Amino acid sequence: MAIAEELQQDITAWILKNKSNPLFLDELDEEQVYSYGVPKDVNGNKLNKIIILIREISLQPNLYGSNHAQEEVATAQIQFFYPNESDTSPLKDDNGNPVYYDYYRDIEKPILDYLHDKEGWSRTIGGGHDFDPDTEQVYSTYHIKKSVNYL
């Protein structure tokens, strides 16, 4: 199985375990995790869902034996696309004020931590949030890596 597909399965498993948390407002959906590309007919804003896209970036030989790579460092990219209404919340705090997402604390970091703890993926670069003017979505991008040993 390819790296992006393995990550897709792992992230899907995390979502299935955690999506009942009321904080996620039904915006986390295991069917909205994609590897390689998002189908053209999928629009996170219309679905009011968070879309997660995984891509493979590189495989770099790291350890050689008998003139053959025995280990490679795999790098993958994970992007989180948020529906443009995800900053509004029907949830209220004790004072009746709306509770908003902290994208990193509530969604991205727990998923990245899960991938690190379960499969040994380490975050290399990424984070920060940007706004896509074409889709009117907030998104973030992370690169993660791990060693793949063939011995």
Where are these regions (language model features)?
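Short, charged interaction patches at domain edges and termini
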Residues: M1-K17, I57-G65, A69-V73, D117-L151
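Small/polar-rich, solvent-exposed N-terminal microdomains that initiate assembly or binding
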Residues: M1-L59, L63-Y64
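Short amphipathic alpha-helices in soluble, non-transmembrane regions
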Residues: I11, I107-Y114
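Broad gene-expression machinery/nucleic-acid interaction feature
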Residues: K49-I51, T75-Q77, Y139-T141
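Mid-chain, well-packed structural core segment of small domains
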Residues: Q70-K109
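Hydrophobic alpha-helical segments of small multi-pass membrane proteins
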Residues: Q77-Q79, D113, H143
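Generic hydrophobic/packing signal
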Residues: F80-Y82, L115, E119
